[in-house]
Amino acid sequence: MEMIKKEEGNKDGPSVDKTTPTEIPPAPTDSAGVAAMMKAWQEFATPGPEHAWMAESAGTWVCDSVKQWMDPSQPPSTASATDVVTMTMNGLYQVTDFSSTMMGMPMQGHGMMGYDKMKKKFVLSWVDNMGSGIVRMEGDYDKSTKTLSMAGKQSDPGRNMETDIRQELKFHDDGTYTMSMYGTGHDGKSEQKFMEGTFRRKK
C-alpha cells in the first residue's frame, strides 16, 4: 500500500511519497507468533497508569465564567459551563459531556479521550453542536508543569479548509484546572486564544 501526498503546484494530481514506508508486514501464522500477537493486543487493551490518572477527573465540574474571544481586539464574552466526566470501556476512555453557551446560543459538546499505549500519546475526539465535523487531537502530559497539551486539526467552513487547533489543560494544586483553547488567528498566520475557563468540582 502506497502513501500518497499532493505536492504544491502539482496539477497532475497526487504523487507517491517515496520516503514513507509502503509495506505492512504479514500477520504471524506460527503458534509462537500468534501467541506474541495476542499478548500484544491484550496489553494494548489493558488500562495503564495514564488511564488511572484520567479516572481521577471523573465527576462534575463547573466554571462560573468561561471567556470566549471572537475578536482578540475586543473584550471576551463570558458564560457559565458544566463538564460531566465519566470513564467507560473498562477504564480505557474518558468521556466528557460539556454544556455552555457560545455567541448567545446553547452549546453542547461530547469528547472521548484515551491513552494510546502504542503511540504513547493521549488521543482525543470532540464533537459539538457548533459544527458537523469531528476534531481530533493528540498530545502529552508534562508532570513538571501539570499540563496536558494536545493539538490537531479542525474544519473551518469560513476558510473552507482545515486549520490548527490546540488545547491545554493545566491542573492546579487547589484541585481546579484551567482549560485554554487556541486556533488560527484572523490573519491566517498567528495563533489566537479563543476560549479559557477555570473549572472546579461541583460539591
PLM feature segments, named:
Residues 1-75, 202-203:
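Amphipathic/hydrophobic helical signal segments and adjacent flexible N-terminal regions
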Residues 3, 171, 181-203:
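Edge beta-strand at a domain terminus
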Residues 3, 9, 16, 130-134, ...:
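Intrinsically disordered, low-complexity sequence elements enriched in Ser/Thr/Gly/Pro
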Residues 53-57, 88-90, 173:
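Solvent-exposed loop and beta-edge segments used for protein-protein assembly and interaction
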Residues 59, 111, 197:
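Residue-level detector of short, conserved catalytic/binding motifs and their immediate flanks
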Residues 63-166:
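Central antiparallel beta-sheet cores of small beta-barrel/beta-sandwich binding domains
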Residues 175-177:
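Exposed beta-strand face motif in extracellular beta-rich ectodomains
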